[in-house]
Amino acid sequence: MAPSRKFFVGGNWKMNGRKQSLGELIGTLNAAKVPADTKVVCAPPTAYIDFARQKLDPKIAVAAQNCYKVTNGAFTGEISPGMIKDCGATWVVLGHSERRHVFGESDELIGQKVAHALAEGLGVIACIGEKLDEREAGITEKVVFEQTKVITDNVKDWSKVVLAYEPVWAIGTGKTATPQQAQEVHEKLRGWLKSNVSDAVAQSTRIIYGGSVTGATCKELASQPDVDGFLVGGASLKPEFVDIINAKQ
């Protein structure tokens, strides 16, 4: 990892927890040592963004797990970046594979969300990744480059964007991409950014890995030169998340 890229660890709590259990988790996180050279962001369920921001130590940022592409309006069940900021969160996760494949969000919609979230001043954790059949068909690069292109077309300021490579076959399955598999895709993504955006953006943009990251797998993954951090699911709800935060130490 280049020294200019600050290690980034996101915890995606998904649709989990209640105030009591999340309060206990927050207590653990507040007591944890967070290295000065590591950025930590937690993404609670929407109903608990306010709660998490009030309880979490300021050293840990808060993200929403999703947002919509416009400011206000007749969009029942949606939240806007402006609302997210009003609750004290500063980041949003967009394009997560569960949004793409469970809720049918298209590349185009995700791109529009990215553009609006950035315009409203949120940082964006933009997720990309291939399914198992796509990897087996040998089209991993084609899929992730197409997804990345739509995101890229909607980004003006790369300083507020973190790319999260999440192979769909490794999310919640217990299968983790090997450090070599992760590094290979991250390196190719950085090369794509260099060719299609700029060398400066390729060098400065953090590309983090998601997909069954645990306390046991994080250190070797973190040692790869193009792995700049993690987006953690299940393990972010457990005390081992502290080990993942400290994976570079």
Swiss-Prot record:
Q: Which domain of life is it from?
A: Eukaryota
Single GO cellular component annotation? cytosol
Principal location listed in the UniProt entry: cytoplasm
**Which PROSITE patterns would you find in this protein's record?**
TIM_1, TIM_2
Q: Can you say where in the cell this protein is located? A: Cytoplasm
> Which residues carry the post-translational modification Phosphothreonine, per the record?
173, 214
Binding of substrate occurs at: 12, 14
The record's note on quaternary structure and interaction partners says: Homodimer.
Q: What is this protein's record name?
A: Triosephosphate isomerase
Q: Which organism is it from?
A: Gorilla gorilla gorilla
